[in-house]
Amino acid sequence: MARKSLIQREKKRRNLEQKYHLIRRSSKQEIRKVTSLSDKWEIHGKLQSPPRNSAPARLHRRCFLTGRPRANIRDFGLSGHILREMVHTCLLPGATRSSW
């Protein structure tokens, strides 16, 4: 189980990313439209004004049961070992066991 502070930090980053998403997207579109270099630099300065944690690159996928940041399966939102345990106990319908 991940520490609760790390999970809360991740939630805060996700909220910030949603809050500043439109600002980032609009400024990136403006950079593509503008041809003069000085205007591009000015718009790029606006792009740097939102907080760092609002950047989508700083988000991590976490297992929604344990909060584990590694070995996540995107389709299920679970880490690999939790997914395997749930398949073995027949908690995920339609998933088949693999024998290693």
UniProtKB/Swiss-Prot annotation:
GO MF terms, alphabetically ordered: rRNA binding; structural constituent of ribosome
Q: GO cellular component annotations, sorted alphabetically?
A: chloroplast; small ribosomal subunit
The UniProt record lists the keyword rRNA-binding: yes
Keywords for the protein's UniProt record, in alphabetical order: Chloroplast, Plastid, Ribonucleoprotein, Ribosomal protein, RNA-binding, rRNA-binding
Organism domain of life? Eukaryota
Location in the cell reads: Plastid, Chloroplast
Q: Name one Pfam family in it.
A: Ribosomal_S14
User: Which Gene Ontology biological process is one annotated for this entry?
Assistant: translation
Which function does this protein serve?
Component of the chloroplast ribosome (chloro-ribosome), a dedicated translation machinery responsible for the synthesis of chloroplast genome-encoded proteins, including proteins of the transcription and translation machinery and components of the photosynthetic apparatus.
Other comments on record = Two forms, which differ in pI, are produced, S14 alpha and S14 beta.
What the record says about family reads:
Belongs to the universal ribosomal protein uS14 family.
NCBIfam families noted in UniProt: PRK08881.1
Q: How does it assemble?
A: Component of the chloroplast small ribosomal subunit (SSU). Mature 70S chloroplast ribosomes of higher plants consist of a small (30S) and a large (50S) subunit. The 30S small subunit contains 1 molecule of ribosomal RNA (16S rRNA) and 24 different proteins. The 50S large subunit contains 3 rRNA molecules (23S, 5S and 4.5S rRNA) and 33 different proteins.
HAMAP family, per the entry: Ribosomal_uS14_1
Q: What is the protein's given name?
A: Small ribosomal subunit protein uS14c
Which species does this protein come from? Spinacia oleracea
